[in-house]
């Protein structure tokens, strides 16, 4: 599948830049993916697409505020404004040299486990926090892909920590907690970012009623 191919490429550590395209009318849902990609690489530019359609629905996102909160460039693209696409392409040609992207913060027990794992990981093109997170998730297929970046010591420590965490997060509770943290972070980022006003069509319908 395309999603798995994209994940494999990102996890190879070879991506110099990543462009993530989001639907302006579904920003909060799309932001979960943005945050997950930021865990793999800080070299992300966000493109908010279909701005015209969002505005017709009465939604106006504050892209400057969104960029400040995410810690990476955010550009809007509108079909009516050809300059918006040109600005995005120029930004991709001249990316910022330093970025401090927003992190997803997990429940305290999981954060403590990440802190224990990170120092045990060898240097690699991928962030230690991301690798530690994947060790805690324990997905066999992904760990196989990442095996070149994982020392035997880190793999053993990850297995031991997963077993210890099973007491506080039995069954699927650990993966559910990780997913929930991403959703909550996206909700916090989006707070106040989108201004909602009645769309023109909705106003007309109200007048007719």
Label the model's feature ranges.
Residues 5, 22, 74-77, 132-136, ...:
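Long, contiguous hydrophobic alpha-helical segments, chiefly transmembrane helices and signal peptides
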Residues 5-75:
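Conserved C-terminal guanine-recognition region of P-loop GTPase G domains, centered on the G4
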Residues 1:
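P-loop NTPase switch/communication element
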Residues 52-105:
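Canonical P-loop GTPase G-domain recognition
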Residues 95-209:
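Extended helical scaffolds that flank P-loop GTPase cores
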């Amino acid at each position: 599948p395309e999603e798995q191919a994209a994940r494999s490429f990102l996890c190879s550590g070879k991506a110099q830049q990543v462009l993530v395209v989001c639907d302006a009318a579904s920003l909060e849902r799309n932001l979960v993916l943005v945050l997950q990609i930021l865990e793999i690489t800080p070299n992300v530019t966000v493109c908010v697409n279909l701005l015209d359609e969002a505005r017709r629905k009465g939604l106006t996102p504050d892209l400057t505020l969104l960029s400040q909160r995410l810690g990476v460039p955010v550009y809007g693209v509108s079909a009516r404004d050809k300059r918006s696409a040109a600005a995005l392409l120029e930004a991709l040609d001249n990316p910022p040299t330093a970025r401090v992207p927003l992190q997803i913060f997990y429940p305290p027990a999981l954060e403590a486990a990440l802190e224990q794992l990170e120092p045990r990981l060898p240097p690699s093109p991928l962030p230690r926090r991301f690798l530690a997170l994947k060790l805690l998730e324990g997905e066999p297929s992904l760990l196989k892909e990442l095996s070149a970046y994982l020392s035997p010591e880190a793999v053993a420590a990850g297995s031991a920590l997963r077993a210890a965490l099973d007491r506080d997060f039995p069954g699927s509770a650990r993966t559910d907690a990780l997913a929930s943290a991403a959703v909550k972070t996206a909700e916090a980022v989006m707070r106040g970012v989108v201004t909602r006003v009645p769309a023109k069509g909705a106003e007309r319908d109200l007048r007719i009623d």
